[in-house]
A protein has these predicted regions:
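Glycine-rich, flexible N-terminal cofactor/catalytic loop recognition
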Residues: 1-57
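Loop/turn-to-beta-strand initiation segments
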Residues: 3-4, 73-78, 154
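Short active-site oxyanion
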Residues: 25-31, 103-107, 154-155
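Conserved helicase motor
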Residues: 54-61, 134-136
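Glycine/small-residue-rich loop that forms an oxyanion/phosphate-binding "nest" at active or ligand-binding sites
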Residues: 56, 64-113
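Class I SAM-dependent methyltransferase SAM-binding "motif I" and its flanking Rossmann-like core
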Residues: 94-151
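A contiguous loop/helix-start segment that scaffolds small-molecule binding in enzyme catalytic cores
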Residues: 154, 158-224
């Protein structure tokens, strides 16, 4: 029986790719990629020429069985996403779950995940935190925000730039204008930036300055 490797890839800076990740990707029989065009650029940069197959949230339910069967037949497979660690607000959970259910060894390499540097650089308490990823866009959004209103731990969210102001405004409504937070964008890239302050200050800043790039919001928990 083969093995499934879960391989993190850089969230921006290609120099964050690990030696081990390159080695694994060069040795496996098949690479499952969220977007073969995006991953193709990464693989070409590191001279990785192994077979690649599209594996994203729209086809994952249909392709999991065939992937599991290939691993059972002895192939080694690597799972990568466009950026960061697969399964963290990215496709990957289903294939990992099915491999575990079928007794297949799953090995996840340590590596890049956008929320970790954002959390550490925020200056907010990080001994205990909760990762929320992307909030629901419609159904369940208000319910989730109400549930988080009494959360004491630091909270971490992903958001797109065009929805940032809407989300910050909703946070102010549910958590209060003076709640401390940070917005990190373009992590590990040339224009990386972290803006810190109260929700009121962040709303003012991003009303005047259009946000760009992938966003991580770190929000302080409620005071005791």
């Amino acid at each position: 029986m083969g093995k499934l490797y879960v391989v993190p890839t850089p969230v921006g800076n290609l120099e964050d790719m690990t030696f081990r990740a390159v080695k694994v990707l060069k040795e496996v029989d098949l690479i499952l990629a969220e977007d073969t065009r995006t991953s193709g650029i990464l693989l070409k940069h590191f001279e990785i020429k192994n077979a690649m197959q599209s594996h994203h949230k729209f086809n994952e339910p249909k392709t999991v069985e065939s992937v599991v069967n290939r691993i059972k037949a002895g192939e080694t497979v690597a799972l990568i996403s466009d950026a960061g660690t697969p399964g963290i607000s990215d496709p990957g959970f289903l294939v990992v779950r099915e491999c575990v259910r079928n007794g297949i060894e799953v090995q996840c390499l340590p590596g890049a995940t956008a929320f970790v540097p954002a959390l550490v650089a925020s200056g907010l308490p990080n001994e205990k935190f909760c990762f929320e990823g992307f909030l629901p866009q419609k159904k369940g959004r208000q319910t989730r925000l109400k549930a988080l209103a009494e959360e004491r731990r630091t909270m971490v969210f992903y958001e797109s730039p065009h929805r940032l102001l809407k989300t910050l405004t909703q946070f102010a409504e549910y958590f209060g204008m003076e709640r401390q937070a940070t917005v990190s964008r373009e992590i590990s890239k040339l224009h990386e930036e972290t803006v810190r302050g109260s929700l009121a200050e962040l709303i003012e800043h991003f009303t005047a300055t259009e946000p760009r790039g992938e966003i991580v919001i770190v929000l302080a928990g409620i005071d005791d």
